[in-house]
From Swiss-Prot:
GO terms for cellular component: small ribosomal subunit. Keywords: Ribonucleoprotein, Ribosomal protein, RNA-binding, rRNA-binding, tRNA-binding. NCBIfam families: rpsG_bact. InterPro entries: Ribosomal_uS7, Ribosomal_uS7_bac/org-type, Ribosomal_uS7_CS, Ribosomal_uS7_dom, Ribosomal_uS7_dom_sf. It holds the Pfam family Ribosomal_S7. It comes from the Bacteria. This is Small ribosomal subunit protein uS7. Part of the 30S ribosomal subunit. Contacts proteins S9 and S11. GO terms for biological process: translation. GO terms for molecular function: rRNA binding; structural constituent of ribosome; tRNA binding. Belongs to the universal ribosomal protein uS7 family. It comes from Finegoldia magna (strain ATCC 29328 / DSM 20472 / WAL 2508). One of the primary rRNA binding proteins, it binds directly to 16S rRNA where it nucleates assembly of the head domain of the 30S subunit. Is located at the subunit interface close to the decoding center, probably blocks exit of the E-site tRNA.
Length: 156
């Protein structure tokens, strides 16, 4: 057990353009090697493409996509009597958002479009329409939880 108390969570500052904390978290997830300016250009560029393509507010499309990506259940490995069980558990709201953003950035980078701006815009629009790799990841996680429902009584 730790000798010191719990570490205080740092409050994320809202981004300057949309005044939104989730957008800041997306920027921080996209950022590589501390290049925040580049990450901001990517995210804001993608939001501009989304606004042009869909005609809707980019932030609303982004939130719709996030709701389609964020998992509700996940499995956690638990060792009982020499056997490992995949125990389905509910995901805390903060972890839901973190996983959603992580999956979004991971599957954005894996896409085939030419620039990162296009990749991110297309992945967000796909996720908003319930398609795309990040939504498939969520479905796979939910399938695993559903398949292991029998071990739910081993919950933590």
């Amino acid at each position: 057990m730790p000798r010191k108390g719990h570490v205080q969570k740092r409050e994320v500052m809202p981004d300057p353009v949309y005044d939104d904390k989730t957008v800041t978290k997306l920027i921080n997830n996209i950022m590589l090697d501390g290049k925040k300016g580049t990450a901001q250009k990517i995210v804001y560029g993608a939001f501009d493409i989304i606004k042009e393509t869909t005609g809707e507010d980019a932030l609303e499309v982004f939130y719709k996509a996030m709701n389609n990506i964020m998992p509700i259940l996940e499995v956690k490995t638990r060792r009982i009597g020499g056997a490992n069980y995949q125990v389905p558990i509910e995901v805390r709201p903060e972890r839901r958002q973190t996983l959603g953003l992580r999956w979004l950035t991971t599957y954005t980078r894996a896409r085939g479009e030419k620039t990162m701006v296009e990749k991110l815009a297309k992945e967000i629009m796909d996720a908003a329409n319930n398609t795309g790799a990040s939504v498939k990841k969520r479905e796979d996680v939910h399938k695993m939880a559903e398949a292991n429902k029998a071990f739910a009584h081993y919950r933590y």
